[in-house]
UniProtKB/Swiss-Prot annotation:
One of its GO terms (molecular function) is leucyl-tRNA--protein transferase activity. Its EC number is 2.3.2.6. The gene is aat. NCBIfam families: aat. The lineage of its organism: Bacteria, Pseudomonadati, Pseudomonadota, Gammaproteobacteria, Alteromonadales. This is Leucyl/phenylalanyl-tRNA--protein transferase.
């Protein structure tokens, strides 16, 4: 029987994702904190936090799950044509904090943000530990787009992206796909299925199939220098 678990501030184990509610889809647990160890434990089991500023911490593992195989993002001809005209540059981990701030900025038709100050502090700590990473898009020296997420073995767990110029976030995603493929990553977790992600090539996997892939790749090895600050290039 599916039921909602309540967490305290001890670093206890998460319940199995199979116990998540079906309505709302994937809600598994409530409470706890955003301690780096708890966050890593969550992602290791296919669970992630997602909540509004005035809510308690909510933990999710939806069914189905949106995933990409690195290198399989669909780029339309119009997108490629547009990007070829740009002189943007791309970096890894050059401006993680600024990317998070960009992702947290208010958006049209959106009431508030789930990327609260507590979330920003928690993921910045994971970044300092070499576990959370960003891709940046620059127009000269102006940050115009980017994304961030966590690397768990050979799995990249995408969290959020933003843009201030058209197609900059899609460019960041293309860069991420190409980069992860070269670094030996096997899976990108895009979390919640939606039409936009599906239009870019995401697959909706049953949760149990996603968990099986996660278990297969979460302890995999990638190059130790994968996430040093560097400039990268978009291949079109």
């Amino acid at each position: 029987m599916n039921s909602l678990s309540y967490l305290n501030h001890e670093l206890e184990r998460f319940p199995s994702p199979e116990y998540a509610l079906t309505d709302p889809n994937g809600l598994l647990a409530i409470g706890g904190d955003l301690h780096p160890t708890r966050l890593l434990n969550a992602y290791y089991e296919g669970i992630f936090p997602w909540f509004n500023a005035d809510d308690p911490i909510l933990w999710w593992s939806p069914d189905p799950r949106a995933v990409f195989v690195p290198g399989t993002m669909k780029a339309s001809r119009s997108l490629i044509k547009s990007l070829k005209k740009q002189t943007w540059t791309f970096t890894i981990n050059r401006a993680f904090k600024e990317v998070m701030i960009g992702c947290a900025a208010p958006r049209a038709a959106q009431d508030g943000t789930w990327i609260t100050q507590d979330i920003q502090h928690a993921y910045l700590e994971l970044h300092k530990q070499g576990l959370a990473h960003s891709v940046e898009v620059w127009d000269e020296e102006t940050l115009i787009g980017g994304l961030y997420g966590l690397a768990i073995g050979q799995v990249f767990c995408g969290e959020s992206m933003f843009h201030t110029q058209t197609n900059a976030s899609k460019a960041a995603m293309l860069v991420l796909h190409q980069y992860l493929l070269k670094q030996g990553f096997k899976l990108i977790d895009a979390q919640v299925v939606n039409p936009h992600l599906e239009s870019l090539g995401a697959t909706a996997l049953k949760r149990k199939d996603f968990i099986n892939l996660l278990k297969r790749f979460r302890d995999g090895k990638v190059a130790s220098n994968s996430w040093v600050v560097k400039e990268v290039f978009l291949e079109l």
